[in-house]
Amino acid sequence: ELARQQVDAGLMVWDFASDEYPDLVMAACGDYPTKETMAAIDIVKTHCPNAKIRCVNVSSLTTVGFGTLRRVADQKFFDKVFTDDKPVIFNFHGYPQTVKSILFNYAVDSTRFDIRGYKEIGSTTTPFDMHVRNETSRYDLAIAAFRQLGRNGVVPFEEAEHLASIYQGKIDENTAYIKANGVDLPEIDAWVWPAARGLDEAKEEAWHGQTN
C-alpha cells in the first residue's frame, strides 16, 4: 500500500526512518543516492540520537515540479514533505542543476537546499569513491548534516566539527585502502539499515543451525 502511494505521488516521507518535527530533512532520488542517504542518517543518529531527521524519497520528478505528470506536488504538499523552513540535504542521481531548476516552481528559499549530484568528476574507480568525488557519499552527507546541525544549535558546534573530522578521516581511510587493494573497505558494502541487521543475524544463525 505504501509503495503504491509513493508511485502515485512520486515522493514520500519514509516514516520508518524519520522523526516528527525534524531539525533537518535528508532527501534522495535514485537507488544509490538513497542507499547513501539512509547510511548517512544511520551515522548521524548513532552519534546524535537527539537530532530529529526526516527522510524523504523522491521517485519521480518533472520539469514543472516534484511528483508525476498526473500528480505534480503543489506548494502545500511540497511544504508538508520538505517543511517550509528546515534545511534540506538532497542527494540526486543526476546533475544538481536539474533539482535546482525544479525548485523554481515553488515559493522556497533555495539557500536552505544543499543539493548533491553528478559533477563529472572521477574516472575508473570504485563505486563508493565515485560518490566521494561527487560529494554524494554517506560520509560526505553525514559531514554536511553534522555541520548543519551545528550551525542550527541542535548539536554543539565543536562537537559537530569533531564528528565531521572523524568522517573526513573515514573518507581518507577508504581512499588509502582503494590505492592499496583496488576495492572499497568491506564495511562500505556490508552496511544495512539498522532494523534489518537483526534479520540478517537471524538468517545467518538459521543457516548455521542447518549446517551444524
Segment roles from a protein language model:
Residues E1-T211:
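Thiamine diphosphate
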